[in-house]
A protein has these predicted regions:
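Active-site-proximal beta-strand/loop segments in catalytic clefts of secreted hydrolases
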Residues: 8-12, 35-36, 73-77, 97-100, ...
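Terminal accessory/targeting
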Residues: 1-5, 125-162
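Active-site beta->alpha N-cap acidic-glycine motif
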Residues: 1-44, 48-69, 155, 161
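Extended hydrophobic/Leu-rich segments
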Residues: 30-33, 105, 118, 146
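Alpha-helical scaffold elements lining the catalytic groove of polysaccharide deacetylases
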Residues: 39-64, 78-125, 138-141
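Generic structural signal for hydrophobic
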Residues: 21-24, 87, 122, 149
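Short glycine/serine/threonine-biased micro-segments
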Residues: 30, 75, 124
Length: 162
């Protein structure tokens, strides 16, 4: 459907899926930082946070040969003024989302019809949509959701365009 995406990945994801992490970049998508171990960022020390962010980026480069894009999504959306400043000082823009649902539990998926209805009800101009790539419901519904939103006149843009 020619829709850009930014995949926020952890070091563990890159380690377990090196081919997919590489393919994301090869296919023209953005790959953003989601830290090494997915901690609550406000709960870690300055030094630990630096390592969480730089360690993930360095591993991405080592394994795939590609640099991460300069975006970071805080694990669980947890942040503080301190973590926002550290992230900015490292050259990242912190990205949050405006649309999401509980799609990350692979053992409790709501189904494609729920996903489609959710997006039909809650979509809006400028939405940043959070979808976890482990979700079978997302995989089943994504083509329909994209076609429906395009039919309503929406255009999908990369984070660089926002």
């Amino acid at each position: 459907e020619d829709v850009p995406a930014c995949f926020f990945v952890t070091k563990t994801y890159i380690r377990d899926n090196p081919e997919l992490a590489t393919r994301m970049k090869v296919d023209g998508h953005q790959v953003g930082n989601h830290t090494v171990t997915h901690p609550s960022m406000p709960s870690v020390s300055y030094e630990e946070l630096i390592q969480e962010i730089t360690g993930c980026a360095e591993y991405m480069k080592e394994i795939t040969g590609y640099d991460m894009d300069p975006y970071l999504r805080p694990p669980m959306g947890e942040y503080s003024q301190r973590t926002l400043k550290i992230t900015q000082d490292l050259g990242y823009k912190t990205i949050f989302w405006s649309m999401a649902y509980m799609d990350y539990d692979v053992n409790n998926q709501p189904g494609a019809s729920y996903v489609t209805a959710h997006f039909e009800k809650y979509h809006h101009n400028g939405a940043i949509i959070l979808m976890h790539n482990v979700s079978s419901s997302n995989a089943e519904a994504l083509e329909t959701v994209i076609k429906n939103l395009k039919a309503e006149g929406y255009r999908f843009a990369s984070l660089n365009e926002l």
